[in-house]
Curated annotation (Swiss-Prot):
One GO-annotated biological process of the protein: defense response
Biased composition (Polar residues): 66-77, 206-215, 223-242
The name this protein goes by in its record: Lymphocyte-specific protein 1
Topological type in the membrane: Peripheral membrane protein
């Protein structure tokens, strides 16, 4: 997971490194071409100096002004080298060493040439040497402006290219390395990969140090919803009690009869039955109908067997049942 999160940054850094490496390779090629051109010019000058020395040896005369001539030539060559872009000696140490080596060889040859016998140093040879010196000065002064213009033009182009290209932060990190002699591309790539790995480790450590915030996911919410539905389903639902005022089956049937109109026909057909009437009850009816009867007669009761009884008060709230004779009864 961590590698997938870091991939975009790594790709950007690799692209930047690729661009920087391409720019460095082009710059190195240009510098190599310039160095090759300078070396060719220096070799041509050395050949010319050697040819001049041979010509002078053939002429057979070297004046005392010869050391001064060699110093003038060395000074001119140094000026040309400075015009060609060798102002910063820290970046180009090799040509300087070659230059000092050439001077050492020239100085080493000077005493050998000066130690020649004085007999050969006649006026004619001195005159010829002066003429030859003037010719050589003219021949060296003629290509100087062109070389100076070419060197200055190359230096200006080099500066313009550096100004147009905006330095990237990774290139700024390698300024110390650029001040030193150019290293091989493999070492450059190794250093850059190390710096990339360090930056990746720093970013990973920063991400790990940050605390993860509690985020409610969809699964947690769904679980809460299911729990709520289960708890609501477990609660018993209140059963609806039937209303007390509902009519019974008999009332409902009579209602339907009234609606259909069958109640009147049924009431007309029904007649009151007298089967439940007892014979003893009729005697009570006759007793109640009699007016002005005695209290005793009110207490007499008849039974279905035909015997009559009466209740006689024996005490406070007490009565006794006494059989009544038929003769004594009114």
């Amino acid at each position: 997971m961590a590698e997938a999160a870091i991939d975009p940054r790594c790709e950007e850094q690799e692209e930047l490194h690729a661009e920087d490496s391409e720019g460095l390779t082009t710059q190195w090629r240009e510098e190599d071409e310039e160095e090759a051109a300078r070396e060719q010019r220096q070799r041509e000058r050395e050949r010319q100096l050697q040819d001049q020395d041979k010509d002078k040896e053939d002429d057979g005369g070297h004046s005392l002004e010869q050391p001064g001539q060699q110093t003038l030539i060395s000074l001119k060559s140094s000026e040309l080298d400075e015009d060609e872009g060798f102002g910063d000696w820290s970046q180009k140490p090799e040509p300087r060493q070659q230059f000092w080596g050439n001077e050492g060889t020239a100085e080493g040859t000077e005493p050998s040439q000066s130690e020649r016998p004085e007999e050969k140093q006649t006026e004619e040879s001195s005159h010829q040497a002066k003429v030859h010196l003037e010719e050589s000065n003219l021949s060296y002064r003629e290509p100087d402006p062109e070389d100076a213009v070419g060197g200055s033009g190359e230096a200006e182009e080099h500066l313009i290219r550096h100004q147009v290209r905006t330095p990237s932060p990774l290139a700024l990190e390698d300024t110390v390395e650029l001040s030193s002699p150019p290293l091989s591309p493999t070492t450059k790539l190794a250093d850059r990969t190390e710096s990339l790995n360090r930056s990746i480790k720093k970013s990973n450590s920063v991400k790990k140090s940050q605390p993860t915030l509690p985020i409610s996911t969809i699964d947690e919410r769904l679980q809460q919803y299911t729990q709520a539905t289960e708890s609501s389903g477990r609660t018993p639902k209140l059963s609806r009690q039937p209303s007390i005022e509902l009519p019974s089956m008999a009332v409902a049937s009579t209602k339907t009869l009234w609606e259909t109109g069958e109640v009147q026909s049924q009431s007309a057909s029904k007649t009151p039955s007298c089967q439940d009437i007892v014979a003893g009850d009729m005697s009570k009816k006759s007793l109640w109908e009699q007016k002005g009867g005695s209290k005793i007669s009110s207490t007499i009761k008849s039974t279905p067997s035909g015997k009559r009884y009466k209740f006689v008060a024996t005490g406070h709230g007490k009565y006794e049942k006494v059989l009544v004779d038929e003769g004594s009864a009114p």
